[in-house]
Amino acid sequence: PPKDDKKKKDAGKSAKKDKDPVNKSGGKAKKKKWSKGKVRDKLNNLVLFDKATYDKLCKEVPNYKLITPAVVSERLKIRGSLARAALQELLSKGLIKLVSKHRAQVIYTRNTKGGDAPAAGEDA
Protein backbone atom coordinates (compact mmCIF):
# COMPACT_ATOMS: atom_id res chain seq x y z
CA PRO A 1 0.00 0.00 0.00
CA PRO A 2 2.70 2.60 0.78
CA LYS A 3 4.26 2.10 -2.68
CA ASP A 4 0.92 2.75 -4.40
CA ASP A 5 0.54 5.91 -2.33
CA LYS A 6 3.92 7.21 -3.61
CA LYS A 7 2.97 6.49 -7.20
CA LYS A 8 -0.21 8.53 -6.81
CA LYS A 9 1.77 11.48 -5.41
CA ASP A 10 4.29 11.22 -8.27
CA ALA A 11 1.47 11.10 -10.77
CA GLY A 12 0.05 14.27 -9.22
CA LYS A 13 3.44 16.01 -9.36
CA SER A 14 4.04 15.06 -12.99
CA ALA A 15 0.61 16.40 -13.94
CA LYS A 16 1.44 19.69 -12.22
CA LYS A 17 4.81 19.86 -13.97
CA ASP A 18 3.04 19.45 -17.33
CA LYS A 19 0.76 22.41 -16.56
CA ASP A 20 3.54 24.76 -15.42
CA PRO A 21 5.47 25.07 -18.73
CA VAL A 22 2.26 26.10 -20.47
CA ASN A 23 1.73 28.93 -17.98
CA LYS A 24 5.36 30.07 -18.23
CA SER A 25 5.47 30.19 -22.02
CA GLY A 26 2.22 31.99 -22.80
CA GLY A 27 -0.43 32.00 -20.16
CA LYS A 28 -3.89 33.31 -20.91
CA ALA A 29 -3.61 36.80 -22.38
CA LYS A 30 -6.30 39.34 -21.56
CA LYS A 31 -8.90 39.60 -24.30
CA LYS A 32 -8.65 42.91 -26.22
CA LYS A 33 -11.62 45.15 -25.52
CA TRP A 34 -13.24 47.09 -28.35
CA SER A 35 -12.42 50.77 -28.04
CA LYS A 36 -15.26 53.24 -28.15
CA GLY A 37 -15.09 54.90 -31.57
CA LYS A 38 -14.58 58.65 -31.68
CA VAL A 39 -17.86 60.48 -32.20
CA ARG A 40 -17.63 63.36 -34.67
CA ASP A 41 -19.97 66.27 -34.19
CA LYS A 42 -22.46 66.73 -37.02
CA LEU A 43 -21.52 69.38 -39.57
CA ASN A 44 -24.59 71.47 -40.25
CA ASN A 45 -23.40 73.11 -43.46
CA LEU A 46 -25.55 75.36 -45.64
CA VAL A 47 -26.88 73.88 -48.89
CA LEU A 48 -27.72 77.26 -50.41
CA PHE A 49 -26.20 80.68 -49.76
CA ASP A 50 -27.91 83.19 -47.52
CA LYS A 51 -27.13 86.86 -48.06
CA ALA A 52 -24.61 87.17 -45.20
CA THR A 53 -22.58 84.14 -46.28
CA TYR A 54 -22.58 85.22 -49.92
CA ASP A 55 -21.28 88.68 -48.99
CA LYS A 56 -18.59 87.05 -46.85
CA LEU A 57 -17.62 84.87 -49.82
CA CYS A 58 -17.25 87.85 -52.13
CA LYS A 59 -15.27 89.93 -49.60
CA GLU A 60 -13.01 87.49 -47.75
CA VAL A 61 -12.32 84.52 -50.02
CA PRO A 62 -10.42 86.50 -52.71
CA ASN A 63 -7.94 87.50 -49.96
CA TYR A 64 -7.06 83.93 -48.91
CA LYS A 65 -3.63 82.77 -50.01
CA LEU A 66 -4.76 79.18 -50.59
CA ILE A 67 -8.28 78.73 -51.91
CA THR A 68 -9.77 75.25 -52.27
CA PRO A 69 -13.36 74.00 -51.94
CA ALA A 70 -12.35 72.29 -48.67
CA VAL A 71 -10.96 75.50 -47.13
CA VAL A 72 -13.97 77.57 -48.21
CA SER A 73 -16.42 74.90 -47.02
CA GLU A 74 -14.80 74.74 -43.59
CA ARG A 75 -14.52 78.49 -43.02
CA LEU A 76 -17.93 79.55 -44.36
CA LYS A 77 -19.77 76.42 -43.14
CA ILE A 78 -21.14 75.59 -46.60
CA ARG A 79 -21.41 72.28 -48.45
CA GLY A 80 -18.48 71.19 -50.62
CA SER A 81 -20.58 71.23 -53.79
CA LEU A 82 -21.68 74.79 -53.02
CA ALA A 83 -18.07 75.80 -52.39
CA ARG A 84 -17.02 74.36 -55.78
CA ALA A 85 -19.74 76.28 -57.59
CA ALA A 86 -18.90 79.49 -55.71
CA LEU A 87 -15.21 79.26 -56.62
CA GLN A 88 -16.11 78.71 -60.28
CA GLU A 89 -18.14 81.92 -60.11
CA LEU A 90 -15.31 83.88 -58.45
CA LEU A 91 -12.96 82.59 -61.15
CA SER A 92 -15.29 83.68 -63.94
CA LYS A 93 -15.54 87.14 -62.33
CA GLY A 94 -11.75 87.26 -62.25
CA LEU A 95 -11.47 87.66 -58.46
CA ILE A 96 -9.26 84.58 -57.99
CA LYS A 97 -6.67 82.76 -60.10
CA LEU A 98 -6.48 79.06 -60.97
CA VAL A 99 -3.27 77.33 -59.87
CA SER A 100 -3.98 73.67 -60.51
CA LYS A 101 -7.00 71.75 -61.76
CA HIS A 102 -7.40 68.03 -61.14
CA ARG A 103 -10.60 65.99 -61.31
CA ALA A 104 -10.61 65.66 -57.52
CA GLN A 105 -8.77 68.75 -56.28
CA VAL A 106 -8.91 72.30 -57.59
CA ILE A 107 -6.51 74.89 -56.20
CA TYR A 108 -6.90 78.64 -56.59
CA THR A 109 -5.02 81.59 -55.18
CA ARG A 110 -5.74 85.30 -54.80
CA ASN A 111 -5.03 87.54 -57.75
CA THR A 112 -1.58 89.04 -57.45
CA LYS A 113 -1.47 92.82 -57.67
CA GLY A 114 1.48 92.92 -60.09
CA GLY A 115 -0.20 91.08 -62.98
CA ASP A 116 0.26 87.35 -63.55
CA ALA A 117 3.31 86.37 -61.54
CA PRO A 118 4.19 82.66 -61.27
CA ALA A 119 2.59 81.22 -58.14
CA ALA A 120 5.49 79.06 -56.97
CA GLY A 121 5.60 79.94 -53.25
CA GLU A 122 2.27 78.33 -52.39
CA ASP A 123 1.27 77.49 -48.82
CA ALA A 124 -0.32 74.06 -48.94
Swiss-Prot record:
A single GO molecular function term of this UniProt record: structural constituent of ribosome
Region (Disordered): 1-37
Entry GO terms, CC: cytosolic ribosome; cytosolic small ribosomal subunit; nucleolus; postsynaptic density
InterPro entries per record: Ribosomal_eS25, WH-like_DNA-bd_sf
The keyword Cytoplasm appears for this protein: yes
Domain of life: Eukaryota
Residue stretches of biased makeup (Basic and acidic residues): 1-22
Residues the record lists as N6-succinyllysine modifications: K51, K93
UniProt-listed GO biological process terms: ribosomal small subunit biogenesis; rRNA processing
Modified residues (N6-acetyllysine): K42, K51, K59, K65, K93
A Pfam family per the record: Ribosomal_S25
Biased composition (Basic residues): 27-37
This protein's UniProt keywords: Acetylation, Cytoplasm, Ribonucleoprotein, Ribosomal protein
Family the UniProt entry places it in: Belongs to the eukaryotic ribosomal protein eS25 family.
Subunit text: Component of the small ribosomal subunit.
Protein function: Component of the small ribosomal subunit. The ribosome is a large ribonucleoprotein complex responsible for the synthesis of proteins in the cell.
Name recorded for this polypeptide: Small ribosomal subunit protein eS25
The organism's taxonomic lineage, starting at the top: Eukaryota, Metazoa, Chordata, Craniata, Vertebrata
